[in-house]
């Protein structure tokens, strides 16, 4: 695969724009940052039909896209083995094609949900309690997310804090919080934004406040934000319980996706030993 250049960028964005639900982060990062972000790198591969595979590395993890099959993966696998990303995300079919060839990774699958733009046309309960967070709040936000059993395994507090600050500074994302008793009790964020859409993520409530309605207040708040700004709202879900709840809440499955997470070194060695 060849390194993407500034000259490649317009046609790559046009290529991705045709299938946005299956390449949301890849498109948003390239649209906002171009190729100037020091924490990013991007590659592409072409064939007789034109652009085929696009790969992007952001803070170490990979996002992949291609609108054709991934049977020929030699150059991509070479890139993955060279860069050793801790995580790889792509549409489901791509992850299914790569997983058997990457035994040091564990596969997980989920769906991309899109919410109706008119869902949250009216103010929701608790809006007066919600504040947009600033960089001074980032360490506490990162600690709260990393303490969550599901979300926390994807990040380290320091690495997540760096990403959150970068999103705030560049306009790629915003965080919103509810404070109680001098601390952040709940948080939601837009983890990526561009003119067409936003991706909501990082919705977490401190264990001491799980009996509150904060989860629903923040979920409604970010839906209102998307509606006011005329953007589609997307979210990614792997938990079947959350999926059932969200499907009842006027969200449609827009795409299926998968992710590969690199196994800890001990797990990899045990598997190689034939256990």
Residues covered by each model-derived region:
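Acyl-donor-binding surface of acyltransferase catalytic domains
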Residues: 58-126, 235, 242, 254-265
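Active-site rim helix/loop that mediates acceptor-substrate recognition in acyltransferases
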Residues: 21-39, 153-175
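Acyl-donor (CoA/ACP) binding surface of acyl/acetyltransferases
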Residues: 175, 183-199, 208, 215-216, ...
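Short amphipathic alpha-helix that is part of the acyltransferase structural core
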Residues: 1-24, 119-155, 266-275
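Conserved acetyl-CoA-binding loop-helix of GNAT-fold acetyltransferases
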Residues: 70-76, 205, 211-225
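Helix N-cap/beta->alpha junction signal
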Residues: 5, 91-92, 134, 239
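Conserved donor-binding loop and adjoining core beta-sheet/short helix segment
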Residues: 1, 20, 28-83, 186-201, ...
